[in-house]
């Protein structure tokens, strides 16, 4: 499976989850570069604080993290200019299947909601839906 994405970002405070997702994405060869962040604030600053860096194609963000949560990350992302948002597909990747969480995420246009674990099938469906 190849999608020719330049950059995928994983934002998750769980090191094991990030490691496994990084391995899966590497094995699938879907991106030239994969970056991982354990803190949402650091990820946001690195990705959108420096306007000289190209925006990532895809960002996976967990909802439940210490410090800035995935919901706060989505708020910051949603406040970016539409032209900036249009360059990146945002996907929540979480263990939560609570209806309150899915409803909160649903208020953000164009944000995908996936439950953990990330699998080859889920990745394939996301790529087909958003990048083909």
Stretches with model-predicted labels:
Residues 65:
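Receiver (REC) domain active-site loop signature in two-component systems and cognate sites
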Residues 52-60:
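Active-site beta3 strand of CheY-like receiver
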Residues 72, 85-87, 91, 96-114:
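Alpha4 helix (beta4-alpha4-beta5 surface) of REC/receiver domains from two-component response regulators
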Residues 6-16, 21-25:
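Conserved acidic segment of CheY-like receiver
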Residues 11-12, 37, 59:
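Conserved sequence signature across two-component system core domains
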Residues 36-49, 70:
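Helix N-cap/capping motif at the beta->alpha junctions
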Residues 45, 71-84:
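Short amphipathic alpha-helix used as the core "switch/output" element in two-component signaling
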Residues 118-127:
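C-terminal output helix
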């Amino acid at each position: 499976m190849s999608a020719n994405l330049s950059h995928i970002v994983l934002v998750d405070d769980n090191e094991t989850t990030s490691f496994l997702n990084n391995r899966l994405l590497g094995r699938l060869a879907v991106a030239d570069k994969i970056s991982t962040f354990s803190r949402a604030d650091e990820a946001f600053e690195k990705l959108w604080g420096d306007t000289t860096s190209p925006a990532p194609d895809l960002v996976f963000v967990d909802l439940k993290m210490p410090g800035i949560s995935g919901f706060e990350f989505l708020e910051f992302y949603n406040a970016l200019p539409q032209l900036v948002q249009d360059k990146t597909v945002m996907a929540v990747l979480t263990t939560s299947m609570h209806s309150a969480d899915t409803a909160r995420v649903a208020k953000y246009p164009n944000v995908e909601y996936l439950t953990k674990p990330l699998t080859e099938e889920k990745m394939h469906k996301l790529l087909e839906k958003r990048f083909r």
